[in-house]
Amino acid sequence: MKKKDPIAEARRYVDNARKALNENGDLDLETKLYQDEKYVRAAGNYLWLGVLMALDAVFHVRKDRRTRVDINNYLEAVGKRDIKLLNYVNSGYDVMHLSMNYDGIPAKEVSDSGFRLANAIIDRCEMMLA
């Protein structure tokens, strides 16, 4: 069985997040707020999972798929190699995981920031793998 490219898979998660918001998020153009926080939460979850997939491809923090890894393990591994990426991951955790996934903040600016950070992290991980 051919192993999947983790960066391509991470980008697929970002596409799924975009699709979840665009097709179901019901954006109010006047207020720039999504009307259904369920899809904001789903998009945040997809984005964060894609980011973790890209980070694991570079840093191999998660040794076993069945075990949970604390965010601090990722931050420690990233901080040893790339401070700029560490800043992206810290911000990404706050935006994608906490603000979007847990809090379901419906502001389009928050979601746009999540997509921008996810793409920046994945791009940086891809560069590190090259």
Describe the predicted segments one by one.
Residues M1-A130:
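Terminal alpha-helical segments
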